[in-house]
Amino acid sequence: MAKLRKTLGGTDWPVCKALMRQIETQSTVTLSRWAVDHAAREYLPLCGEAPALKAAVEGCRKHLTGQLSLKELKPLLREASAAARDTEGAVEQAAARATATACAVIQTPTNALGYLFYGAAAAAYSKAGTEDASRWDDLARAELEQALEELRAVSVPDEPNPAKINWNC
């Protein structure tokens, strides 16, 4: 059996470079809304019973509409991160990490790329299984390409307040 990785993808992949360039053009709010919606749709269903993750997604949505302060949101983000660490199973844990990391984009805009690496692993493992490593990279690449298309679709043209991004990779 191939060694499972927590994440799939890499910053040297052309699709990741394109994602990075697109992320750099958008505001933290746009990135957060996109990441939370994408993770809730694609990865949260793979997590099984995950009340802390569901609460974090709802908390982020409330924060983005002004119904919850960042101070009130932070405990939900911490609980989601802890729940992701404690999740069992390769698919479930990768999906949980993707969801928790997506929720934290509002605090750390570079998570808009990081959550996708966890999500790519969750998608690949759920589609190919954890035994068939030969398909993982292709499935991960397809997942990242889909995410890039979705980000481009919701991007604000000529965003006046792009997030301050410092890629440490």
Q: Which residues are covered by each model-predicted region?
A:
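C-terminal binding/interaction regions
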Residues: Y125-C169
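Structured binding/interaction patches within domain cores
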Residues: A2-L139
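Short, low-complexity, intrinsically disordered N-terminal peptides in bacterial proteins
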Residues: M1-A2, C169
